């Protein structure tokens, strides 16, 4: 039987933003400049060129859209863009901007070339989005003054600014909004080598002794995500200080991560609950998203946005027109025999010695 207890505990390998105290620590570990930024080499190279060109012309950088799974550095890049441009950054999120006046207040307080960062930009309301279009294109907004028959529209000029939008669901952006971004970048999962470097850098900032093997052990279980790598590092640090001599080695990291229920594939209890339900209740699939969500008691959005991206990227899970299918490697990971299905050629392939 696949274990599914203790599933209500917070996920230590979740890439979602942590509580306020954890968020303060995460901000302290963020790189401040492109030269310090590790990974996403192509995006980093592009931004270096675009930023330098904008500075040479004494112009605001073109609007930037960053998308990809959570925890890969979209917010960090927004702060870096502002720092490299030498301007202020104003930060908000799509759900916070409920009314057109909320956005108008932000825009009218911007200084020339400032960066406005909107996280979860796909969640902007249609009313707010309509106000944003002329602001992005013409650096102007239309506001209504008065009510009833006496109401009139007034056009306000805005200073040139850069909008940096971040989203985990680029497909939910409307075409008119997406088309107004001059720079569009997708952030990819990090390699274990890149994450090991990030873990080593963060350990130095936290004044924690760690060897290369310990950094690699944490990195390979961090699901390709820097936010998770830094979170695991802090928990392994706690374990090392209490259960060991304070230094993080590979055996110490392994023991700490197993205590946290993070296995050698980087899967935690939530992942194993999802995959276990697919294997035990649906024979490995195909299974529809709604059925899977009902089986494990999670929302479809949580499965799509939080659980699936890494599992699909690693080949543990497949999306097909008929539904989700668990890969042969996951059957093996759970110690179960891969089923032979009639007419399934892959069963012959995976059952071969």
From Swiss-Prot:
Annotated family: Belongs to the RuvB family.
Organism: Aromatoleum aromaticum (strain DSM 19018 / LMG 30748 / EbN1)
Top-level taxon of the source organism: Bacteria
Region entry Large ATPase domain (RuvB-L), spans: 4-190
Location of the protein in the cell: Cytoplasm
Function (record text): The RuvA-RuvB-RuvC complex processes Holliday junction (HJ) DNA during genetic recombination and DNA repair, while the RuvA-RuvB complex plays an important role in the rescue of blocked DNA replication forks via replication fork reversal (RFR). RuvA specifically binds to HJ cruciform DNA, conferring on it an open structure. The RuvB hexamer acts as an ATP-dependent pump, pulling dsDNA into and through the RuvAB complex. RuvB forms 2 homohexamers on either side of HJ DNA bound by 1 or 2 RuvA tetramers; 4 subunits per hexamer contact DNA at a time.
Binding residues annotated for Mg(2+), in chain numbering: 75
Subunit note: Homohexamer. Forms an RuvA(8)-RuvB(12)-Holliday junction (HJ) complex. HJ DNA is sandwiched between 2 RuvA tetramers; dsDNA enters through RuvA and exits via RuvB. An RuvB hexamer assembles on each DNA strand where it exits the tetramer. Each RuvB hexamer is contacted by two RuvA subunits (via domain III) on 2 adjacent RuvB subunits; this complex drives branch migration. In the full resolvosome a probable DNA-RuvA(4)-RuvB(12)-RuvC(2) complex forms which resolves the HJ.
PANTHER family: HOLLIDAY JUNCTION BRANCH MIGRATION COMPLEX SUBUNIT RUVB (PTHR42848:SF1), PTHR42848
Entry GO MF terms: ATP binding; ATP hydrolysis activity; four-way junction DNA binding; four-way junction helicase activity
Main subcellular localisation: cytoplasm
Keyword Nucleotide-binding: yes
Region (Head domain (RuvB-H)): 264-353
InterPro entries, A to Z: AAA+_ATPase (IPR003593), AAA_lid_4 (IPR041445), DNA_helicase_Holl-junc_RuvB (IPR004605), P-loop_NTPase (IPR027417), RuvB-like_N (IPR008824), RuvB_C (IPR008823), WH-like_DNA-bd_sf (IPR036388), WH_DNA-bd_sf (IPR036390)
GO annotation terms (biological process): DNA recombination; DNA repair
Gene giving rise to this polypeptide: ruvB
EC number(s) on file: 3.6.4.-
Gene Ontology CC terms: cytoplasm; Holliday junction resolvase complex
Domain-related comment: Has 3 domains, the large (RuvB-L) and small ATPase (RuvB-S) domains and the C-terminal head (RuvB-H) domain. The head domain binds DNA, while the ATPase domains jointly bind ATP, ADP or are empty depending on the state of the subunit in the translocation cycle. During a single DNA translocation step the structure of each domain remains the same, but their relative positions change.
Binding site for DNA: 319, 324
Residues reported to bind ATP: 29-30, 71, 74-76, 137-139, 180, 190, 227
UniProt protein name: Holliday junction branch migration complex subunit RuvB
Record's keyword terms, sorted: ATP-binding, Cytoplasm, DNA damage, DNA recombination, DNA repair, DNA-binding, Hydrolase, Nucleotide-binding
Region: Small ATPAse domain (RuvB-S), residue numbers: 191-261
Reaction catalysis annotation: ATP + H2O = ADP + phosphate + H(+)
């Amino acid at each position: 039987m696949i274990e599914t207890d203790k599933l209500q505990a917070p996920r230590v390998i979740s890439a979602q933003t942590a509580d306020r105290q954890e968020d303060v620590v995460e901000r302290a570990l963020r790189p401040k400049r492109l030269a310090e930024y590790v990974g996403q080499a192509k995006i980093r190279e592009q931004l270096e060129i675009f930023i330098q060109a904008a500075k040479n012309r004494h112009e605001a950088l073109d609007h930037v859209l960053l998308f990809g799974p959570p925890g890969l550095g979209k917010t960090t890049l927004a702060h870096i863009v502002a720092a490299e441009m030498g301007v202020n950054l104003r930060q908000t999120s799509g759900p916070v901007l409920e009314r057109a006046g909320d956005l108008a207040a932000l825009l009218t307080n911007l200084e020339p070339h400032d960066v406005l960062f909107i996280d979860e930009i796909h969640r902007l309301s249609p009313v707010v989005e309509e106000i944003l279009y002329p602001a992005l294109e013409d650096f102007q907004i239309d506001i209504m003054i008065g009510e009833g028959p006496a109401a009139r529209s007034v056009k306000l000029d805005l200073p040139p600014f850069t909008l940096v939008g971040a989203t985990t669901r680029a497909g939910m952006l409307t075409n008119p909004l997406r088309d107004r971004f001059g720079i569009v970048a997708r952030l990819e999962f990090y390699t274990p080598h890149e994450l090991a470097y990030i873990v080593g850098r963060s350990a130095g900032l936290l004044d924690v002794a760690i060897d290369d093997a310990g950094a690699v052990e944490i990195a390979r279980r961090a699901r390709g995500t820097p936010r998770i790598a830094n979170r695991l590092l802090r928990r392994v640090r706690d374990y090392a200080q209490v259960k060991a001599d304070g230094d993080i080695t590979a055996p110490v990291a392994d023991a700490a991560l197993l205590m946290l229920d993070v296995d050698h594939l980087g899967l935690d209890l939530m992942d194993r609950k999802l995959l276990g339900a697919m294997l035990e209740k649906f024979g490995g699939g195909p299974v529809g998203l709604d059925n899977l969500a009902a089986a494990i008691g999670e929302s479809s959005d949580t499965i799509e946005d939080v659980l699936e991206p890494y599992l699909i990227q690693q080949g543990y899970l497949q999306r097909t027109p008929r539904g989700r299918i668990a890969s042969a490697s996951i059957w093996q990971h759970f110690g179960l025999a891969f089923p032979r299905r009639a007419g399934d050629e892959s069963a012959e392939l995976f059952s071969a010695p």
